Amino acid sequence: MHPECPERLQTVLDGLSDKPFRHLSRHEAPEIDLKLVEMVHQPYYVENIVESIPDQGRVHLDPDTVMSPRSLEATRRSSGAAVEAVDRVMAGDATNA
C-alpha cells in the first residue's frame, strides 16, 4: 500500500492539533493559477503532469508518485499555500511561515 492515504492525512491533522502546535494559525490554502506554477516549472512539464491526471482511479508516474483525480487540486492548493505564506510574511501579517 502506498503511504499516501486518508488515514495518513488524519494522523498529520491530529498531530497538528496537539499542544505544541495549538498556537499556530491555520488558513485554507487557495488554489493557485497554474501560470504561477509555470514560473518555476516549464509549461510543457506542467502540461504533461496535468494530462497525466486520471479521471478515476490512480496512475503511478514512478514508484513514489501516485496521481488521482484530485491531484491537480492538491497541487494547486499546496503551491497556493506556499505563495500565501510568503505573502503573509511579506505583508507583515505573519513573522514566519
Predicted ranges, named:
Residues 1-97:
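HDAC/HDAC-like amidohydrolase catalytic core signature
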